[in-house]
Amino acid sequence: MQFPHPGPAAAPAVGVPLYAPTPLLQPAHPTPFYIDDILGRGPAAPTPTPTLPSPNSSFTSLVSSYRTPVYEPTPVHPAFSHHPAAALAAAYGPSGFGGPLYPFPRTVNDYTHALLRHDPLGKPLLWSPFLQRPLHKRKGGQVRFSNDQTVELEKKFETQKYLSPPERKRLAKMLQLSERQVKTWFQNRRAKWRRLKQENPQSNKKDALDSLDTSCEQGQDLPSEQNKGASLDRSQCSPSPASQEDPDSEISEDSDQEVDIEGDKGYFNAG
């Protein structure tokens, strides 16, 4: 009995299991010869090639998790200060993610917390530069008048150097000021007016004439200081014997005229 000679097609069937390459795979069971097994680590997942992070990538969430202990103002609790993670965060936290790879390491909450931090006195840290003084107040508590109020006060002062209480009340109501503010403004303005008179004595006579005419029209008496500076006869306005004998007796206690000459002298000497 003769067997047929095997053809060339039968040879590959025998050679496939003999010459097929077998891939080198890590054994499934742990062995004591691999470094990962010695260190007790499992098979690590393949790490992708590092690329530049984008705002939409998962790198943002990774940065926020490592950035929290770095920029948080609360220090690390002493019980966890010896932990290696705390030392790692302190060593690599500020510079690891604050470089050019991620130019915006802080979120809005970080800057908001910085603005709301408080100093030991209990005031906000960045609050003092934004404090503004009231516009109508100066340093020292002096009142700053508006331009319209100053113009009206100057007009009134040109025609009348002294105000009676009813006139002062009416002027204060018109300018929306208090009577004390109007009185103080006139005192300071008279002190400035006297200082200018001393610097320019030639205008004393003209000012005295103008004040005398105004006083005669309004039925008011001039203060004693203006009488001493002007060479005029008091009998032109009111020829009373009391005023000719004693110029200081013209201002009675019952008069409505405001008497603040001493206060003006004190302000002038202080200035």
UniProtKB/Swiss-Prot annotation:
It holds the Pfam family Homeodomain. Keywords: Cytoplasm, Developmental protein, Differentiation, DNA-binding, Homeobox, Nucleus, Phosphoprotein, Repressor, Transcription, Transcription regulation, Wnt signaling pathway. One of its GO terms (molecular function) is sequence-specific DNA binding. One of its GO terms (cellular component) is nuclear body. Its main location: nucleus. Signal peptide: none annotated. The modification Phosphoserine is found at S54. Residues 138-197 bind DNA. Residues 1-138 are annotated as: Interaction with SOX13. Interacts with CD81; the interaction prevents nuclear translocation of HHEX. Interacts (via N-terminus) with SOX13; abolishes the SOX13-mediated inhibition of WNT-mediated transcriptional activity via competitive inhibition of the SOX13-TCF7 complex. Interacts with EIF4E; the interaction inhibits EIF4E-mediated mRNA nuclear export. Recognizes the DNA sequence 5'-ATTAA-3'. Transcriptional repressor. Activator of WNT-mediated transcription in conjunction with CTNNB1. Establishes anterior identity at two levels; acts early to enhance canonical WNT-signaling by repressing expression of TLE4, and acts later to inhibit NODAL-signaling by directly targeting NODAL. Inhibits EIF4E-mediated mRNA nuclear export. May play a role in hematopoietic differentiation. PANTHER family: HEMATOPOIETICALLY-EXPRESSED HOMEOBOX PROTEIN HHEX, HOMEOBOX PROTEIN HHEX. This is Hematopoietically-expressed homeobox protein Hhex. It comes from Mus musculus (Mouse).
